């Protein structure tokens, strides 16, 4: 069983058909998610002083269109993650994403946005390879210093469907060359940088 994301894992998103692609996700990607979950969730639990549970996306609502990406999440809620600030690891066909995510299902979204607006210095202090996104369904992300961060956070506050995600994107080529140990080290390092934001923005 593979314990890291191979080129084949990223090629999964070229497979036609919902069932065929889901079979490949279960075979090539989800075992790696499980392994990452076992290693990373105890770290987050310690660092956050609250239990963090692993959720692996099952794409159960899909009936026709195959998913363009897939992910796992770490959340303080055993039953779900979408209504809570949470940490994600996932793949599109060309990159890995490692996020702290505030998505549109989050209740009291405007309160989180206001706190982020009041603590933008936490975001500007992140390493230069960190990026932000305002829509988890889109591949694109922007460097934090280039974004008009305030404008994006205002939109996150005021627009119901707007989101805020911050973390790292790593190319498929780079990820597929990594060992399992290097991959987990990268995820841990990314989350270590994001934990202070998670704690502050409650």
From Swiss-Prot:
Record InterPro entries: UPF0637, UPF0637_domain_sf
One Pfam family hit = DUF1054
Q: Where is the signal peptide?
A: none
Q: Report which superkingdom the organism of origin falls in.
A: Bacteria
Assigned protein family: Belongs to the UPF0637 family.
What is the recorded name of this protein? UPF0637 protein Exig_2520
- Could you read off the lineage of the organism from its UniProt record? Bacteria, Bacillati, Bacillota, Bacilli, Bacillales
